């Protein structure tokens, strides 16, 4: 784990007990947008990168056979595990070094994890590695307010600004 990631993990470990109370409503809106994008689909393996307290996987468990939540924070993962979401596993790991086999997932979601100026290239490269062809992807990306959109994604990507600093990108199979 890199130095910045250790600081992030420590911050979320400290925040974990009150995270849902503080950010639950804001995050719930994002989860609903992603679930709308994924509606009427069913996946073999759905991966939630930066799963936090596991709320998204709890809401999405009916659209997949198996789900995997990945997060840097041990305490956030404990809360996620305590939800007892059916057919869900949780892994302590970084979003830029996913401990998953190549071509192992057909859907990946990452909400409020990636930052355009920091880890985006590694994040996208690792996503590409673990996703099967014809996979669905939905992720939000933090960018500095007023900064130009420097993200270059395939033509299949749709973007929706969800706040002054965060954009939702959704990609369907070509």
Predicted feature locations:
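A short glycine-rich, Lys/Arg-flanked "PGG" loop and its adjoining helix->strand segment in the class I
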Residues: 121-133
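Conserved beta-strand signature within the Rossmann-like core of class I S-adenosyl-L-methionine
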Residues: 134-142
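Class I SAM-dependent methyltransferase SAM/SAH-binding core
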Residues: 47, 53-97
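Core SAM-dependent methyltransferase catalytic element
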Residues: 159-174
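Conserved class I S-adenosyl-L-methionine
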Residues: 1-40, 145-147
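A short SAM/SAH-binding and catalytic strip from SAM-dependent methyltransferases
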Residues: 107-119
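Short alpha-helix
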Residues: 145-156, 167-168
